[in-house]
């Protein structure tokens, strides 16, 4: 995306460049090339993205949601990160020197990928098995948007979780491929983490940073380094940390203690298990463990039974902010303009201080307000005791594309030396989640996903799986997108939007762009009962699927939605006959609306089963609209809207507006879409 932004702002505003800018283009193109029909998403956690992608792939397989997953990361060298790190004075004028001189990073580029597969599936097709993925750990620092916690707490939380989820102990790890960026703060925190966890427990641990050879490949780093770690294990060879001079070795010996940092030359050693660590802007930490011989260690991932419930709703919409304003707008049948806003009253209500929120870009402000609103609405107090037992999945369609384009536009005019250290941190997609972690104190699972509008529903599905795995008691799942001048301009250039008001099923060629941020607090029913929370509804099933079509289109992808619905029904152990209503994604653009009605008609008699749409009042808010569908459904099932609610029923070849009795609803299906053919379906129950 970065290279496309360069061309767009420095050469000509070509619409084809705009289509290549979103991170979601990457996974969609890969899915189309390899024919993937299951879960397709992009993990957008900056330098930890590749590692988290492999972890999520393994989770999906263990949950029975996939047999084979292509997982990895890619990043191309471009002006925005170069100028940004230059503005932070974080680039070493020489080659980077991790765990040595630590004067700064050297930027690299590349891609890494692994095929993650169930053992049974791999055996059945006679595949070569390199290793087993045992377990992973993911956490948030809740500290600073660019710097790690000096005490290494977040890093150690992720590392310990990976060891625990792998069913192993510290002594079982033979080699750690460290994050090792070559910056002083990162290297010092990682030194501390490794010593704290392994000293006195593992006397023969090898550690190295392969970034000394590749440079920092940013979003690709975790995946590339996972491949390094796996190959190290396969070949029983520890890759070196290069760049040490003779006079550096004594300093290293003093700092390393019994940890072997393998300076300058590789080391032959029997390696049975390896750990790969990745840490990122936003305070995101990820650790994953691979084992050479499958079956020698048992993964300790547990699957928690019982219901998952919605206990809090945070809402920032063009109709106003907070649940009360949204309900009032629904009762009064109000529509809105296309832009959400937050200001001093919102920050004060959520106890956000000016010293904090003035640092945030608009997208992150929307997310901070809605996230804190969900905690407030759910009566959930984050404390030191429970901060690690609650996490978040941030879903976004365009994410930080607006701030990134703004940064690129600035340096296209001023040159790479004209970048802003203040603005640069907001160009990573996981900035909004990082800021929410900081202001809320949440230190648990922290992942940002991006793949079109359905990201706001995919976040709910992902959060459900994290809770089912037993890794967190509670999760905030969000959908957040902004309608800035930059984003609106990109959509106009693609001839997808109009300034006119467009209603669902109008058969237009365009839609009305809007924005917002919706945060949904999910937790186990046991957790909710223990603290006396009053749930809105239960979330009983999810499904995700993909039917590849050219990125930027949806035409011909209805099979993907049908497969997602089928998977959600199976997951919830229910049937189409039990569904009382559907909250759909129609936005007035006939290409989108047709795929929805085509797939829904395969399961439901749409002359009887109503289709409700939140976009009637708020427009196409993308990920925000998808998450709003869940929030709206939760309010209906909870009884906050006991009177009639507007919906659509099929009348011949048309979908016509009508009213349905909200009080009679017991089970609701929520669906959403993405350009390229990705779909998510979630089932809510009273």
Predicted regions and their residues:
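Condensing-enzyme catalytic core mediating Claisen C-C bond formation in acyl metabolism
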Residues: 95-166, 175, 295-340, 495-574, ...
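Active-site-proximal alpha-helical scaffold in enzymes
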Residues: 23-26, 34, 40-73, 106-127, ...
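Conserved catalytic cysteine-centered active-site region
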Residues: 2-9, 15-56, 65, 81-83, ...
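Short, well-ordered amphipathic alpha-helical segments that serve as non-catalytic structural scaffolds
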Residues: 24-27, 53, 117-119, 151-167, ...
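Flexible, low-complexity linker/loop segments at domain and module junctions
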Residues: 166-172, 198-203, 255-311, 383-387, ...
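Conserved active-site "lid/cap" helical segment
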Residues: 1, 158-170, 324-393, 400-401, ...
């Amino acid at each position: 995306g970065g290279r496309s932004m360069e061309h767009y702002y420095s050469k000509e505003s070509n619409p084809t460049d705009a289509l290549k800018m979103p991170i979601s283009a990457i996974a969609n193109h890969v899915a189309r090339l390899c024919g993937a029909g299951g879960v397709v998403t992009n993990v957008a956690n900056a330098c930890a993205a590749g590692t988290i992608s492999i972890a999520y792939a393994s989770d999906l397989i263990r949950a029975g949601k996939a047999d084979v997953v292509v997982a990895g990361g890619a990043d191309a060298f471009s002006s925005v990160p170069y100028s940004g790190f230059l503005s932070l004075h974080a680039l070493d004028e020489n080659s980077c020197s991790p765990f040595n001189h630590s004067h700064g990073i050297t930027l690299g580029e590349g891609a890494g990928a692994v095929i993650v597969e169930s053992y049974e599936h791999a055996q059945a097709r006679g595949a070569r098995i390199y290793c087993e993925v045992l377990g992973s750990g993911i956490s948030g620092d809740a500290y600073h948007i660019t710097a790690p916690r000096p005490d290494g707490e977040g890093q150690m939380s992720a590392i310990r979780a990976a060891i625990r989820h792998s069913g192993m102990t510290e002594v079982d790890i033979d080699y750690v491929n460290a994050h090792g960026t070559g910056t002083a703060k990162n290297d010092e925190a990682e030194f501390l983490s490794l010593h704290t966890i392994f000293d006195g427990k593992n006397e023969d641990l090898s550690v190295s940073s392969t970034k000394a050879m590749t440079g920092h490949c940013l979003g690709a780093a975790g995946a590339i380094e996972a491949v390094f770690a796996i190959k190290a294990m396969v070949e029983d060879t520890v890759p070196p940390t290069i760049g040490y001079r003779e006079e550096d070795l004594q300093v290293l010996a003093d700092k390393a203690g019994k940890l072997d940092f393998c300076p300058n030359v590789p080391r032959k050693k029997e390696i049975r298990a390896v750990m790969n660590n990745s840490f990122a802007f936003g305070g995101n930490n990820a650790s994953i463990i691979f084992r050479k011989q499958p079956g020698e260690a048992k993964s300790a991932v547990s699957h928690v039974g019982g219901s998952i419930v919605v206990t809090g709703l945070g809402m920032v919409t063009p109709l106003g902010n907070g649940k009360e304003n949204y309900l009032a707008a629904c009762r009064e049948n109000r529509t809105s303009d296309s832009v959400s806003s937050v200001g001093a009253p919102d920050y004060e209500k959520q106890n956000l201080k000016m010293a904090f929120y003035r640092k945030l870009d608009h997208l992150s402000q929307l997310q901070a307000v809605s996230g804190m609103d969900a905690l407030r609405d759910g009566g959930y107090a984050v404390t030191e005791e429970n901060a690690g037992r609650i996490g978040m999945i941030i879903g976004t369609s365009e994410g930080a594309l607006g701030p990134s384009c703004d940064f690129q536009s600035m340096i296209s005019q001023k040159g790479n030396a004209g970048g802003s250290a203040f603005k640069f941190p907001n160009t990573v997609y996981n900035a909004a989640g990082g800021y929410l972690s900081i202001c809320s104190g949440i230190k648990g699972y922290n992942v940002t996903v991006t793949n079109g509008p359905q990201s706001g529903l995919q976040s709910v599905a992902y959060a459900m799986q994290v809770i089912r795995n037993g890794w967190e008691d509670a999760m905030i799942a969000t959908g957040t997108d902004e309608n800035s001048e930059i984003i609106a301009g990109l959509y106009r250039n693609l001839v997808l939007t109009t300034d006119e008001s467009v209603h669902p099923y109008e058969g237009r060629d365009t839609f009305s762009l809007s924005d917002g941020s919706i945060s949904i607090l999910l937790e186990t029913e046991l957790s909710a009962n223990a603290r006396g929370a009053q749930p809105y509804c239960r979330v009983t099933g999810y499904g995700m699927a993909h039917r590849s079509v050219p990125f930027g289109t949806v035409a011909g992808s209805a099979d993907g939605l049908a497969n997602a619905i089928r998977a959600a029904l199976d997951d919830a152990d229910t049937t189409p006959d039990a569904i009382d209503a559907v909250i759909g994604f129609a936005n007035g653009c006939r290409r989108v609306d047709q795929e929805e009605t085509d797939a829904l008609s395969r399961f439901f008699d749409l002359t009887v089963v109503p289709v409700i749409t939140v976009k009637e009042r708020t427009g196409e808010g993308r990920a925000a609209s998808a998450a709003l569908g869940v929030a709206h459904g939760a309010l209906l099932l909870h009884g906050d809207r006991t009177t009639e609610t507007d919906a659509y029923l099929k009348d011949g070849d048309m979908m016509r507006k009508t009213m349905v009795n909200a009080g009679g609803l017991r089970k609701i299906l929520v669906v959403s879409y993405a350009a390229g053919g990705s779909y998510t379906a979630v089932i809510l129950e009273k």
